[in-house]
């Protein structure tokens, strides 16, 4: 069907008809070229250099004294080189701890993707790099050691803190739907990518914390 003929609520809405290449989950592992652009990610017009997206990982339960967790591991390829990813996720009262160990050889960008939604509301604010943006905004922040998302309505604050500086990119995930009023865009959530330029032959460690709290 032609959305324009069905009564589109905005012109050019067909530009937003983009089909995802994978399921929108979290802790998704990407390998990109150095020259990847945010708009290419938004439109799914980029080349994935690794084969980890959509592939199964080996799952192992971790029993720690102060937390429960899981370890996920997989051997795959990145730019034609053998790479192994080991990631552990520990669940604590204060939040989540994520640790990565990447072994092999790669020159480019490694990115971890999170997809978040606060009851489908586009109005919680993202505070990163001295800027405040809405969840429905796109943004790219360089050299970030920590950032947080604040939802006044839910009285909730979600903070990410990294062991070393990363670039944080985010953009809205929207669907194009037909309602009684016509064809329109509907906000579903926001994709966050934690980007790290890496050039190694051996191993690389990365880690971050996710903490939960109230708005103060």
Predicted regions mapped to residue ranges:
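Solvent-exposed N-terminal domain segments of exported/luminal and surface proteins
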Residues: 1-23
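Proline-rich intrinsically disordered, low-complexity coils
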Residues: 3, 56, 122-124, 172
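Polysaccharide-binding surfaces and accessory modules of carbohydrate-active proteins
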Residues: 103-167
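Long, contiguous hydrophobic alpha-helical segments, chiefly transmembrane helices and signal peptides
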Residues: 22-32, 39-42, 87, 110-116
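Beta-strand-rich recognition/accessory modules
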Residues: 31, 35, 40-105, 145-216
């Amino acid at each position: 069907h032609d959305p324009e003929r069905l009564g589109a609520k905005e012109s050019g809405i067909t530009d937003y008809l983009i089909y995802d290449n994978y399921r929108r989950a979290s802790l998704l592992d990407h390998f990109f070229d150095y020259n990847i652009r945010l708009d290419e990610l938004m439109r799914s017009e980029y080349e994935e250099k690794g084969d980890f997206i959509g592939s199964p990982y080996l799952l192992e339960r971790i029993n720690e004294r102060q937390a429960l967790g899981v370890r996920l591991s997989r051997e795959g390829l990145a730019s034609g080189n053998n790479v192994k990813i080991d990631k552990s996720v520990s669940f604590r009262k204060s939040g989540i701890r994520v640790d990565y160990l990447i072994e092999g050889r790669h020159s480019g960008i490694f990115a971890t993707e999170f997809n978040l939604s606060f009851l489908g509301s586009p109005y919680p604010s993202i505070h990163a790099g001295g800027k405040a943006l809405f969840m429905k905004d796109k943004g790219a922040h360089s050299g970030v050691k920590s950032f947080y998302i604040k939802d006044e309505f839910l009285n909730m604050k979600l903070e990410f803190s990294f062991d070393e500086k990363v670039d944080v990119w985010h953009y809205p995930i929207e669907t194009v739907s037909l309602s009684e009023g016509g064809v329109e865009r509907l906000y579903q959530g926001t994709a966050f990518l934690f980007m790290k330029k890496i050039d190694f032959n051996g191993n690389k460690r990365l880690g971050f914390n996710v903490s939960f709290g109230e708005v103060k």
